[in-house]
Structure formats: structure tokens, C-alpha cells
Swiss-Prot record:
Segments traversing the membrane: none
Keywords: Mitochondrion, Mitochondrion nucleoid, Transcription, Transcription regulation, Transit peptide
UniProt entry tagged with the keyword Transit peptide: yes
GO MF terms, alphabetically ordered: DNA polymerase processivity factor activity; nucleic acid binding; transcription elongation factor activity
Family: Belongs to the TEFM family.
Superkingdom of this protein's organism: Eukaryota
Transit peptide, residues from-to: 1-23
Gene of this entry: tefm
Biological process per Gene Ontology, one example term: mitochondrial transcription
The protein's name in its UniProt record: Transcription elongation factor, mitochondrial
Cellular-component GO terms for this entry: mitochondrial matrix; mitochondrial nucleoid; ribonucleoprotein complex
InterPro entries: RNaseH_sf, RuvA_2-like, TEFM
Knockout-associated phenotype: Morphants show reduced movement and have abnormal neuromuscular junction morphology compared to wild-type animals.
Taxon lineage: Eukaryota, Metazoa, Chordata, Craniata, Vertebrata
Biological role: Transcription elongation factor which increases mitochondrial RNA polymerase processivity. Regulates transcription of the mitochondrial genome, including genes important for the oxidative phosphorylation machinery.
Length: 363
């Protein structure tokens, strides 16, 4: 059944009268015929009684109006600034623009290489993952790079990615953090500084996890052993899992993760003076997934491919997104292949969480 937008002013008769045929004057009043607009097949070519919907007089007008929509939102000078940035910036420079981190910056560079420089703002939405609304935000960010930072100075909104609430200035002053991710049988952590240089990166097996009756003393012994190797850092960032309590099949896993999370907070938190920020923070797992475009619906996919690219860029590029020491690249270069996914998934997530923390603070 066709979904018809608008009202057909003519009367459709059964028999030999077609949809666009005028009935005899004696039978019905003289109504003006109007074109049908089909919302589900606007770009397709459909014929009705010698009427070509793809070449109708209204379609080119609509296409022309849409083609001018983005470009007409900006002055000639603003369009020149935006196109200059998009046509000349490197991948790492594009990642500094809001919404262009990860795959979007890669797609822009690939599109330029294949099709040449962008000739109009409208052509930008041909890039995969960039649609009308996101393109507007990208353009505004290029024209006003400091606006958002000035507006959001103060506290980071709880709903975004950090809990508990912390003054943004304290987070921005952090010289290094330790990102911690817990799995069903191991704990992984990454030590990273403000320049996104990986200082250390490890994981440890925990023999008591998900065993028997979840004996608290065994959990405490394993977790204490892991954190005893942590270096000094300004903040400890613990991943907040996104398992729903309604998913009863994963209830044992959720209890395990919450138990480890509570012990990490207790063991890593120190007595602090009134007004000083907490040192142990939660970071939403979903926020990290959205930052790296790893979400499929409500589920987060593996970030192994993203991490492998970061490690490669650290060796090949002069200004990489993340700087890995040479010994860590050699040590972990084969840890994130498909055949060893379960071996290094927690390490992968810990590293990505640290990168997302510093990059989100720059927005």
C-alpha cells in the first residue's frame, strides 16, 4: 500500500478512467489535477499513466532547495573557512574538531582522496557517518572552537561520563590517571599521562573471581595484590559496566563486577580533606563505546581494531593519537588479534577508557 502525502483533489473512478485521466464533463465537476507525492519512493523512477514521478516538475525544485540548505546557512566567508579546514586538515587535526574523532576523520580523508576536495558544504554529508545534523555541529565547531569549553567550564555533568561529580578544573589539572577494567577472571589497567602517552599497561589473573561462593576474603586478597603494583596517579578511573539488572541470566556476573568495583573504591580511596576531589571515579562503559563509535544499538562491540590502529599509528606517524613505548608495542602487538580476543579484551578496554577520558575533557 502506498503512503500518500497530501490530498488528491481529483476523483478516481473505476473502469476505463485512469488515475490522471479527466472524466467526462457531464459526469463530474471540473476539478484541477494535482501530482501525488509518494514519501517512500521519491527518488525512484515510477510511471503512472505516462507520468514520470522522477522527472516531475516538482522534484527538481525540491532537490534544488535541499541542495542549497546547508550552504545557505552560512556566509561566503564562513563557507570558505569550513571548506579550508575540511580540505586541508590531516586526520589528527580533524580529530580535534567536535564529532570528528575516530572513524569520521578517517572517512573524510578517504573521501577527499577518492573524490577530491569538497566543493560545497552539502557534499560533506556524502561522507559515511556524517549526516545533516552532525554536519551542522561540525561546521559550528570549526567556526567557534572555544565556545563549548567556555560554556562547560565548571563541573562535568553526571549523565555524560564521570561519577561522582567533580569540578572540571581538577580533572583538567590531572597529570596522569590509571584506568581500570575488571573482567570475569582478571583485572587490567593502563597508566596514561595528559599527553596520552602510555606509561604502563598490564593485566593480572585473579584466581578467586567467579568461583564458589564469592568468598570476600579471597576477593580482597586478589584485588589487593593487583593494586599493590599501581604507580602513583592523580585519579583512578574504574569502568562502570552497563549490565541491566533486568537481565537475570547475567545476574551472577553483575554481582561479581559490583563486588570488585566496591572493593576497588574502598582500597584506593584515601582519607581526604573537605573540599578536595575524590581520587576514585567511575567512567560509563557506554560513553567510551559512543566516543569510539563502537555501539550497535545498546550493545558495545570490541575496540580491538581501534586499538590496533592506534598502536600502528604510534609507530608510523609523527603525531599519533596515542604514544606507545616501543617495548609495549612489541609486547602486546599480537594480543588483540581475533584469535586472542578473550586474552586481551580487558586490556583493550582499559586503554580505550584512558584515551576517552582525556579526549572528552578537551571538548
Amino acid at each position: 500500500m502506498w503512503i500518500v502525502k497530501g490530498i488528491l483533489s481529483s476523483v478516481v473512478l473505476k473502469g476505463h478512467y485512469s488515475l490522471f485521466s479527466r472524466p467526462p464533463p457531464s459526469s463530474l465537476p471540473d476539478y484541477a489535477l494535482r501530482f501525488l507525492h509518494f514519501t517512500c519512493c521519491r527518488s525512484s523512477k515510477i510511471m503512472f499513466s505516462e507520468f514520470d514521478s522522477s522527472n516531475a516538475s516538482i522534484s527538481p525544485e525540491l532537490r534544488q532547495e535541499n541542495a542549497k540548505a546547508l550552504d545557505s546557512c552560512y556566509t561566503e566567508e564562513q563557507r570558505a573557512v569550513i571548506l579550508q579546514r575540511l580540505n586541508t586538515a590531516t586526520e589528527s587535526e580533524l580529530e580535534q574538531v567536535k564529532l570528528l574523532r575516530g572513524r569520521k576523520s578517517v572517512n573524510i580523508v578517504k573521501y577527499r582522496t577518492r573524490h577530491g576536495p569538497f566543493s560545497s558544504l552539502e557534499s560533506v554529508i556524502n561522507v559515511p557517518l556524517l549526516k545533516y545534523k552532525s554536519a551542522i555541529m561540525v561546521f559550528d565547531s570549526i567556526l567557534n572552537p572555544d565556545n563549548k569549553r567556555k560554556r562547560n567550564k565548571g563541573k562535568v555533568h553526571l549523565a555524560k561520563f564521570i561519577k561522582p561529580d567533580v569540578n572540571r578544573a581538577h580533572l583538567e589539572d590531572a597529570s596522569s590517571i590509571i584506568s581500570i577494567v575488571c573482567g570475569t577472571n582478571k583485572i587490567a589497567w593502563a597508566h596514561m599521562d595528559r599527553a596520552r602517552t602510555v606509561l604502563d599497561w598490564q593485566q593480572a589473573e585473579c584466581q578467586s573471581f567467579m568461583k564458589g561462593t564469592y568468598l570476600a576474603s579471597d576477593y580482597l586478597e586478589d584485588i589487593s595484590s593487583v593494586i599493590s603494583s599501581f604507580p602513583a596517579a592523580d585519579f583512578f578511573l574504574v569502568e562502570k559496566p552497563s549490565i541491566s539488572p533486568q537481565n537475570t541470566s547475567l545476574f551472577p556476573v553483575m554481582v561479581h563486577l559490583r563486588t570488585v568495583e566496591a572493593m576497588l573504591f574502598a582500597l584506593l580511596s584515601q582519607a581526604r580533606e573537605p573540599g578536595s576531589p575524590p581520587k576514585v571515579l567511575n567512567m560509563m562503559r557506554i560513553s567510551v563505546g559512543r566516543h569510539f563509535d563502537l555501539m550497535v544499538g545498546d550493545c558495545r562491540t570490541s575496540g580491538a581494531e581501534t586499538l590496533r590502529k592506534m598502536m600502528t599509528d604510534s609507530v608510523m606517524k609523527r603525531d599519533p593519537r596515542v604514544l606507545f613505548p616501543h617495548d609495549l608495542v612489541l609486547k602486546h602487538r599480537n594480543s588483540f588479534q581475533m584469535s586472542s580476543r578473550n586474552k586481551g579484551e580487558e586490556m583493550c578496554d582499559a586503554l580505550l577508557q584512558a584515551v576517552a577520558f582525556f579526549e572528552l575533557l578537551q571538548e
